[in-house]
Amino acid sequence: MASNLVVARGGVEFVPPISLAFWRWTVVFLILLPFTYVTLKNNFHIIKKEYKKLFFLGSMGCGVCGAFPFLAGETTTVTNMGIIYTSSPVFIILISYFFFQEKINLTKVIGLIACLIGVFVIIIKGDIDLLINLRFTIGDLWMLAAAIGWALYSIYLFYWNSELKIFERFTLISFFGALSLLPFYIGEEIFYKQT
């Protein structure tokens, strides 16, 4: 996650954010495809059954979580991005509770609080002034959406069983992720003005 946020903050100065996400997942798909092509071809009947779920996973995991941090990087800081992204476990617990009736117990709450405190301390390097002086921007909303997207991806990846092996499944998730970004990539290529 940390390297992704650094790329999000620095990379958008050189490459438009949607392009960065689109090409990232396109390259991932092209790298994986030679290793999974035969299996995917043999399991095409499974892909036909599961493509809607795979598209959703690709849209959340590669589209929302791939592009939104890069969009956020245009207007917010790496510190803000890191702090907001750590809210993902909160959303995972809440969504699992409301939609999958998974119980929230004291152990989960304590673990979550300890995790969030630890991440906050690392991100702000123990400097409370840094936390007090945080300023929020539109980029923070992009990061909040990315955190929710990651939560949805994580939950449905866990709950949706697949007949495909994980390597083949991830190949298709990267494909559908790039596909979900394609119309936005085309729009960005047409309308984006480098500043």
Please report, for each region that a protein language model flagged, where it lies by residue:
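Specific transmembrane alpha-helical segments of multi-pass solute transporters/efflux pumps
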Residues: 1-5, 33-85, 121
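Hydrophobic residues within membrane-embedded alpha-helical segments of Major Facilitator Superfamily
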Residues: 7, 27, 56, 60-64, ...
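Specific alpha-helical transmembrane segments that line the substrate/conduction pathway
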Residues: 19-30, 66-108, 146
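Membrane-interface helix termini and inter-helical loops of multi-pass transporters
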Residues: 6-17, 44, 73-74, 78, ...
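Cytoplasmic-side transmembrane-helix entry/capping segments in multi-pass membrane proteins
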Residues: 49-58, 104-117, 164-174
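Helix-helix packing/entry segments at the starts of transmembrane helices
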Residues: 21-23, 62, 66-67, 80-87, ...
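Hydrophobic transmembrane alpha-helices of multi-pass small-molecule transport proteins
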Residues: 32, 107-126, 181
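Glycine-/small-residue-enriched transmembrane alpha-helix faces in small-molecule transporters
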Residues: 1-22, 132-159, 179-184
